Amino acid sequence: MEQSEKTEAQYVDRQGDLSRSDSDGVDGLSWTKEEEDKLRHKIDWHCVPIVTVLYLLCFLDRINIGNARIQGLATELDLNRGVRFNWVLSIFYIIYLFVEVPSNIILKKVGPRFYLPFLVVGFGFVSMCTAFVHSYEGLLAARAFLGVFEGGAMPGMAFFLSCFYKRGELLFRIGIYVSAASMAGAFGGLLAAGLAQIPEWGIASMRIYAWRNIFFFEGLLTVIIGLLAPIWMPTDPATAYFLNERERRIATERLAREHKSHPDERVSWAHVKRAMLCIHNYTCALGFFLINITVQGLSVFMPTILADFNYDPVKAQLMSVPPYVCACLGAIAIAYLSDKTKQRGLYLAIFAVIAMIGFAILRWHQDSDIKYMAIYFVTIGAFPGGPAFLAWAINNSAGPSVRAVSSAYVVTLGTIGGIVSTWTYIKEDGPRYPNGHTVNLAGQIGVFFLAIFGILYCLRENKLRAAGKRDHRLEGLNEDETLHLGYRHPSFRYIT
């Protein structure tokens, strides 16, 4: 019994506020708050910017097909026949879906420094090749290969950051890099408007013009940055090149004390089961699924929706920029507040209501100016949801292996929302797209109720654990087995 009490006392989490002037580690290592703040500042400058840039390129190469569509792609490759364009979008997410979990397991084994840039170079090269496609079938193949490389990017980057940051620090950082998705929408609209104007160039049958310029130059930029990324990207806190020896020890120990797990543990089937059987992960995955219907749908179809407001192609590209900029700033602000207040579900519920208002206006209002205002509501309301659900799942997963599987698992199920999104706005439903707006409105209502459920579930579990109703899980376990309980440990507390 004494051993059990000792182990439990060592495990207590205190929700991310453990290691300020700590001296109870195994090796007696202690540090001050000032040292930890300085360390976190260094990590911020060396990890967050590179991940943000890489994810911006990832999302840019994913959604540029929406910009290319109104610059002649659909007409030249006969994508307006039936639902061909929707199949081109779907094939990407179908492949993407099956890549995420295996990719994160590989990442855990080989490390992120070269693996993540490898993925970036891969999808950048595929984007360049898309510029030379001359048929519907060729475009399908290109999008499938894009899914192979992009599938591991988002969950991989989330796991990478979780290896450097404590639970209470994570959402703000994930919020910054995932906000690159909305910035890619803004940046993509500006780039597309400019690149499409470049005069035709190339040789023989490999002529590049209009929509082909979009794929070629955006892909080329991605490849160049991907090749340079390993110079800047660290592998893990224990070997980070920008930290001195003491800082490396602090960076490693502060995470070990919070999660009470072995940082170098190998992924096993037990970790996979623990991640996939967690009720909270199901909640976050379903929420991510519903959010993705909106975010992925808007990212690809916004130029088309705006073009149906009677804007010409160039104006439609440019008018998509301001809503994305607002969404980006909003996502970062909410991520910051969420980390400061250690609340996740509350902000998800509030912003779901904002998105609901926007989709209600788009569904039932006629005036184009009012509907354009509604675009701001839906982007600001929906875009913060993805990083919030992902961070919420990672926050409530203990141990690097479980976090790796959890992040990939949540994004994998969420990717099904991306598949659904490709069928929400079909050509026959335009120009008002009532069915697409109705589906998204229903999805945001679902997000609201899932956020409320997640809060109540976490509060209930924390209350039961505080009352000793989960202490039976420690019976018959030695210290090492107790450390591997993860989120099931009686002293683990969920972030709400």
Predicted regions and their residues:
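Intracellular terminal tails of multi-pass secondary transporters
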Residues: 1-63, 70-71, 230-261, 265, ...
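Extracytoplasmic
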Residues: 46-82, 99, 103, 188-192, ...
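Conserved MFS/SLC helix-loop-helix module at the cytosolic interface between two early adjacent transmembrane helices
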Residues: 97-137
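Extracellular/lumenal inter-transmembrane loop segments of multi-pass membrane transporters
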Residues: 70-85, 110, 128-140, 148, ...
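Structural signature of the two symmetry-related core transmembrane helices
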Residues: 114-128, 346-361
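Residue-level signature of mid-helix packing/kink "hotspots" within the transmembrane helices
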Residues: 63, 93-101, 151, 186, ...
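Helix-to-loop junctions at the C-terminal end of transmembrane segments
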Residues: 98-111, 329-343
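Extracytoplasmic gate region of multi-pass secondary transporters
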Residues: 66-67, 270-335, 390, 422
